[in-house]
Structure formats: structure tokens, C-alpha cells
Design a protein with these regions (language model features):
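Short, flexible active-site loop motifs that bind/organize anionic cofactors or intermediates
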Residues: 8, 28, 95
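Short beta-to-alpha connector loops in regulatory alpha/beta signaling domains
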Residues: 9, 33-36
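Two-component/phosphorelay signaling modules centered on CheY-like receiver
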Residues: 11-30
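CheY-like receiver
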Residues: 13, 36-121
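Short gly/ser/thr-rich secondary-structure transition/capping motifs
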Residues: 32-33, 55, 129-133
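Conserved beta-strand positions in the Rossmann-like core of class I SAM-dependent methyltransferases
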Residues: 6, 30, 75
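Non-catalytic signal-transmission and effector/linker regions of two-component phosphorelay proteins
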Residues: 1-4
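Conserved binding/recognition cores within well-folded domains
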Residues: 114-135
Length: 135
């Protein structure tokens, strides 16, 4: 299973680092760094994982997170740990504190992969029982 990714960040160095991490992770593919392309991809519901910075000039990541389709999992990437609590209020899958190390990135990516694998499994483990009383 390959997961498509979008990077939304205003820092070129952070973008390059995340692109490098995505390239090193076999089950992740495709990244958009242009904010217009990213927004189009987000609204077209074509991204599985969104690596989203929080503090950005025009629209912050928290505001943008409310525009993300429910199918897309958000992993926040920020240098400000005080946003950690807020990130889980918008149902983020994970929160990576900058500077991001590859092992932390990989753990978050594995969490996303596991989430999608579980979401795609058929729900056959539910048993339905019907009792009828007939006179």
C-alpha cells in the first residue's frame, strides 16, 4: 500500500527535509510543495497524508486543517510544542516537533499506514444475531 502525501510548509528547508524523508520511505509517494497545488489536491480528496506546518503567513495550519477532507490524515510539523494539544482537537494523527528526526517521521508514517490498512479491512468481525419469537 502506497500513501500519497502533501507537504504544506512555508520554510524551504523544512520542505526539503520532509521530501527527503518521503523519498526514503518506500510506502510514501508524491509530494506537493506549491501551496496552490497542495490546496487543489487537498480539495480534490486525493491525498492520504498531509504533513502540515502550523505557523504560516497567510493561513495557519489549524485553519487549513478544517478544510481537509475526513479521508486525509493530518500529521502536524511545527517548532512550537504548545500546539500539540490543539492538534489533537482537530483529530490529527500525529504531531512532529521540529527539527524532525527520521525515526520520529517514520513512526508517524507507520502510524498513518496502519490507520489506512485498518480502514480498508472489511468489517467482518461484527456478528449480527436476530431473535424471533413466533407464537
Amino acid at each position: 500500500m502506497n500513501l500519497s502525501c502533501i507537504i504544506v510548509d512555508d520554510e524551504p528547508l523544512a520542505i526539503r527535509l520532509l521530501e527527503n524523508f518521503i523519498e526514503r520511505t518506500p510506502f510514501l509517494k508524491a509530494s506537493f510543495t506549491d501551496s496552490v497545488a497542495a490546496m487543489q489536491s487537498i480539495t480534490n480528496d486525493s491525498a492520504d497524508v498531509l504533513f502540515l506546518d502550523i505557523q504560516m503567513p497567510d493561513m495557519n495550519g489549524m485553519e487549513l486543517s478544517h478544510m481537509v477532507p475526513s479521508h486525509t490524515r493530518i500529521i502536524f510539523t511545527t517548532a512550537f510544542k504548545e500546539y500539540a494539544f490543539d492538534s489533537y482537537e482537530v483529530n490529527a494523527l500525529d504531531f512532529l516537533l521540529k527539527p524532525i528526526r527520521y525515526n520520529k517521521f517514520l513512526a508517524a508514517a507507520e502510524k498513518a499506514k496502519k490507520w489506512f490498512e485498518m480502514a480498508l479491512q472489511p468489517q467482518n468481525n461484527q456478528h449480527t444475531t436476530v431473535f424471533l419469537k413466533v407464537d
